Amino acid sequence: MDHYEDQIAEAMDLYARFGVDSVKTGYVCDDGQVERRNPAGGTPLREWHDGQWMARHHLHVVQEAAQRHIAVNAHEPIKDTGLRRTYPNWISRVGARGMEYNAWGQPPNPPEHEVNLVFTRVLAGPMDYTPGIVSLKGRNGQAIPSTLARQLALYVTLYSPIQMAADLPEHYLQHRDAFRFIEDVAVDWDQTRALNGEVGDYVTIARKDRHSRDWFLGSITDEHGRLLQVPLGFLEPGVRYTAQIYRDGDGDGADYASNPFAFVREERQVSSADTLELRLAPGGGQAIRFVPMDGKR
């Protein structure tokens, strides 16, 4: 860690010189501790990720970045305690089992994991979960416990002001309909509404884009399929919207374990007076973009 500490300022100067305005830091270590120099010499000291020494280190990194107007997205971070209010360049972090555990974790994250995160980890602050794995495959072909539509819904249910398109480009080329939502979804929100939910079972979140009149909705479930009635009263009254719907297929047995790629993209006209019926497959989800039809953005 001392090698990082000694070079942080120089590294941030380099990034600033090349116009880099954001960095993602990481502190992966297999045994859960990082090494630092022993001031007395001899055997290096070992520090826990959430210990005081690492808390000071993370704050030092964010302060150095802030002086150069560089944003920080920390992986293997300390927990969010509200200091992102003091340092708004501390834009996101992980701080829980992220999508990478679906790539190589034994076991991977079960379907209820992301639902639980909405009621636990995400209450503390933004989480860089790195959704959008449309291949639904991890290391050595390990299946990710998710449907394709669920990967899109995670962009709305798990808040982060910076999001990743975390899959390979060739996989997005194979799923252009799904990738369209990733291109369109906002990350900077003006309003957030929790429409329904039970801890560990299901949740539906709606958010309004800060830079347009568009609304986005994400709904996810655990390993059980669900049929949810969602009133659209959050939409602007008196305005007709085009609902661009990305959902699990309903007539072809969509299921995260047996048929995760069953997927439908469709459009409907709706208003704030309507109620949508969301059919979520086991381990599935639904993502919707609501665009005003009056042409006013």
Annotate each PLM feature.
Residues 1-136, 143:
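Aromatic- and carboxylate-enriched substrate-binding clefts and catalytic-loop regions
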Residues 1-4, 30-34, 79-86, 136-139, ...:
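Flexible loop/turn segments at secondary-structure boundaries
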Residues 11, 60-61, 142-145, 192-193, ...:
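Generic recognition of flexible, low-complexity loop/linker segments
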Residues 24, 69-76, 100-104, 161-175, ...:
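Acidic/polar loop patches that form or flank catalytic/metal-binding clefts of enzymes
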Residues 26, 72, 157, 217, ...:
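Conserved, mostly hydrophobic/aromatic
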Residues 141, 150-169:
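Catalytic domains of carbohydrate-active enzymes that cleave complex glycans
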Residues 167-216, 222, 251-261:
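Glycan-recognition and catalytic regions of carbohydrate-active enzymes
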Residues 223-297:
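C-terminal beta-sandwich/jelly-roll accessory domains of carbohydrate-active enzymes
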